[in-house]
Design a protein with these regions (language model features):
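Beta-rich, blade/repeat-based domains predominating
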Residues: 45-59, 89-106, 110, 115, ...
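Beta-propeller fold detector
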Residues: 84-88, 127-131, 176-182, 222-228, ...
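A short loop-to-beta-strand structural motif that recurs across blades of beta-propeller domains
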Residues: 72-74, 115-117, 163-165, 210-212, ...
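Bacterial N-terminal signal peptides
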Residues: 14-23
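N-terminal secretory signal peptides that target proteins for export/translocation
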Residues: 1-8
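Short loop/turn segments that connect beta-strands within beta-propeller blades
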Residues: 77-81, 120-124, 168-173, 215-219, ...
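A short helix->beta-strand "capping" segment at the edge of beta-propeller domains
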Residues: 31-47
């Protein structure tokens, strides 16, 4: 048996260590942002009113189109509070959707010149990946595990006539695209993303304020299913998480709606700005949502409980 004094000192040390552990845990929890509470992270006016296409690379950097002027792509480094110029598209081109594949290539939809550009990992120079005169105006992009791109292609001047494109990588490294067939006449196709298993494509339609689901079969959109519609406010960009929930930007409502795959409205996240155009998942654990705001032309962010589908695609170890 240890002497009483020595035992008492040992008990004091043990109690101190436990208290420190509790204190540090409390500080860690306090430092963690509350879930589903949005805050602005960049200055107002950094981007044009065409702010769109947020996408995060494997290093955690955020990229957004139309930084300072149309045609530029801005980069918000991980943890930074101000964007910087990353690159510019060729004269006359204006970007919209951005996505990254597993190899770190960046793809940019160019609605003005009917292109999809690619920027190789570690580079800043855009190269033409795919062009078609049949494009209305390529808008947003979704990417599958094998690198297949799906592009929404709305005709904003008409409530019908929207398209969805499927673009694959050919042996020469160039994109090969085709308009997907559908048993349903499409409206103003806008936001687009895949289910976690890659079997279902979700598409928002601005004019009808609806989100539709399609079963994928090559270049066919099958079994159209209305996931959810809204009585007011346009719908814009959308992304899915690993549980198959849909995060949907509700333009002019100032909210991100979180919708179950069954169409249930699970939550609405109030935002700092009233005109969210699009969103993406990022952060070291894939649980940070970044939102582009047309009103004020800034980026805001909030934490969520589950990672996004795409971060888990790029870095499977996090999921």
């Amino acid at each position: 048996m240890a002497p009483v004094g020595r035992r008492f000192r040992a008990e004091l040390v043990a109690a101190y260590l436990v208290a420190c552990a509790v204190c540090l845990a409390g500080q860690s929890n306090a430092a963690e942002d509350p879930l589903f509470v949005s805050k602005k992270i960049t200055p107002q006016g950094e981007y044009t009113s065409g702010i769109e296409g947020p996408a995060v690379d494997a290093a955690g950097n955020l990229y957004v189109v139309n930084f300072q002027q149309s045609g530029n792509i801005g980069k918000l480094a991980a943890g930074a509070s101000q964007s910087q110029l990353f690159t510019s598209l060729s004269a006359g081109s204006i970007g919209n959707g951005i996505r990254f594949d597993r190899q770190g290539r960046m793809y940019v939809a160019d609605f003005k010149k009917h292109n999809v550009w690619v920027i190789e990992r570690g580079e800043t120079t855009p190269h033409l990946y795919f062009h078609s005169d049949r494009f209305n105006q390529p808008n947003d992009l979704a990417i599958a595990a094998d690198g297949t791109l799906y592009a929404s292609d709305p005709r904003f001047a008409s409530p019908v006539g929207g398209q969805i494109w499927r673009i694959t990588r050919g042996a020469d490294g160039k994109g090969q695209g085709e308009v997907m067939s559908s048993t349903r006449r499409l409206g103003v196709t806008n936001g687009i993303d895949l289910s976690p298993d890659g079997a279902t494509l979700y598409v928002s339609e601005s004019n009808s304020r609806q989100v539709w689901a399609y079963r994928l079969d090559g270049s066919k959109l099958l079994d159209p299913r209305l996931v959810r519609g809204f009585a007011d406010f346009e719908v814009d960009g959308l992304r899915t998480d690993v549980d198959g929930r849909i995060y949907l930007a509700r333009l002019s409502a100032g909210k991100i709606a979180i919708i179950g795959a069954d169409g249930s409205l699970q939550r609405e996240v109030p935002l700092s700005g009233k005109q969210p155009t699009n969103l993406t998942f990022g952060g070291p654990d894939g649980r940070t949502v970044f939102v582009t705001q047309k009103e004020g032309r800034f980026i805001e962010t909030f934490r969520v409980d589950r990672p996004g589908r795409e971060p888990c695609l790029q870095m499977p170890r996090m999921c």
